[in-house]
Amino acid sequence: MLSNLKSQMRKGLLEYCILSIINRDEAYASDILDTLKEARLVVVEGTVYPLLTRMKNEGLLSYRWQESTGGPPRKYYTLTEEGKQLLTQLNE
């Protein structure tokens, strides 16, 4: 029970942090991970990527593909209006 509660709280905190990061400017998943790590949050790709997908499926995020000179195309995330509204509500 306690471990499930901790897991849910952590996901909620990460979701808030991701919304805040993307609100500043569109972001590539790797940049999001770096920003979270700079804030001393212990995160791994295996947590962030599924969370980004879930948030996109919930209508909080959208993305666009951009060609990369050093590899495959990159997916850049932005907040949707719904994502901006949620972040505003969370900040109140």
Locations of the language-model features?
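Basic, amphipathic "hinge/linker" alpha-helix immediately C-terminal to the N-terminal HTH DNA-binding motif
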Residues: 69, 73-91
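N-terminal helix-turn-helix DNA-binding core of bacterial DNA-binding proteins
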Residues: 6-47, 66
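Short secondary-structure boundary/capping segments
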Residues: 53, 68-69
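Short amphipathic alpha-helical/adjacent loop interface patches that line ligand
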Residues: 26, 36, 52, 83, ...
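Glycine-centered, phosphate/nucleic-acid-interacting loop/turn motifs that mediate DNA/RNA or nucleotide
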Residues: 59
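Basic amphipathic alpha-helical segments that dock to polyanions
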Residues: 48-50, 54-55
